[in-house]
Amino acid sequence: LKAKERGAKIVVIDPRKSETAVRADKWVSIIPGTDTALGLGMIRWIAANGKLDKPFLKQHTGAVYLVDKDGKLMREDAKDPNSYLVFDEKSQKLVRHDAKNIDPALEVKAGSPYRTVLSMVLEQAEPWTPEAVADTTGVPAATVVELAKDYSTNKPSMIVNNMGSFQRTQYGTQAVGAQYYLALLTGNIGKAGTGICDAGGVTQMAKFGSAFPPPPNKPKKVAPIPTAKLGEYVLAGKPNKINFWYTQTCGI
């Protein structure tokens, strides 16, 4: 609420009229599980009304990367995973994304054997007119437009989704993905006051000690286990055989 005192507009999108919603500038009630539709509808309006941050998309995102008909990212060298290809507006040729003095296209001509990542995102958003969003989410079409306009024009803008929120529900990953696309498409990321914040606003917290007492013969140094290699380490008993696993306050 300190941000509100400094002039920020706070909008809460929540089926419930929570404590935060009561204090916000606007509360938008939404049908549970329909957040992805709202995000895609906002993306559609932003693109259709010239609110894309094109310089940001070209310089700082993979929106310009080319995708072939099989849905695979195109690369100059199959052995180099970072050699993504883009279509250069200046030379009218396919070049590496990190080549100098190029102007990568955000979209290419219809009928081309490839398309950009941005085109694929906008294709997903195309069916979601304000009216279609309203039918699915229960959010009035005028409110959908208002949200998209405010988010894309009143910069900096930030999305706070409170520790994953609907990410723990069915198709929640798509909802979070739509939020990140909103931030990237409008340049609302990587700058002060922007981004996607997954921190919570919890104030009622109880303090507990360790769930288990420390082992009496705990070694001084225990090698960490890389999250990405967790399965491999467990199956191989590496660095030690694992008979019991306890996870607290995080996912695996």
Regions found by a protein language model. Name each.
Residues L1-V11, A37-L38, K100, P104, ...:
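Extended redox/cofactor-interaction regions of prokaryotic respiratory oxidoreductases
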Residues K4-K9, R16-N154:
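Long, well-ordered, tryptophan-enriched scaffold segments
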Residues K17-S18, G33-D35, R44, G71, ...:
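Short, glycine-/Ser/Thr-/acidic-enriched flexible segments
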Residues D25, S157, N243:
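Conserved acidic residues
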Residues K26-I30, I43-I46, T173-Q179, A211-P214:
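Short secondary-structure boundary/capping segments
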Residues K51-F56, V144-V145, M158-V160, G187-D198:
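Acidic/polar loop patches that form or flank catalytic/metal-binding clefts of enzymes
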Residues W128-A134, V160-R168, I242-Q248:
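Glycine- and acidic
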Residues V144-V145, Y151-G177:
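P-loop NTPase catalytic cores that bind/hydrolyze ATP
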